[in-house]
């Protein structure tokens, strides 16, 4: 489990903008990284759309939003185009960042346990420190909660 006030683990993943995203090269700003199970599913679509609606407000606070799932770049591009998502989505097919950030683990649904992506959001400051984690996220109003927290710490 990732801890608040710890150094953000470094990773490099392919991005929907056809470039690699390296966390250590993006620390000139706050980063709101959200891990989600799958493109084009109801909860994940709502979460992406909610962050997209508030994207300009995050940008005004010098915060970039990044979504990460195991989906391919091709899937991410279709998802971005379909729902007009203004931020990058990263493909973590090998579960590099998912595991480093504790977003991969045991889940349960309808009484069955299985391994999967746990909906998680991490807020990182420009010094590379994790300042807040949200685990087992409920989508409704989550993006507003992240934005409000960011406003409090700036």
Language model regions located:
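Chalcogenol-based redox active-site neighborhoods
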Residues: 1-154
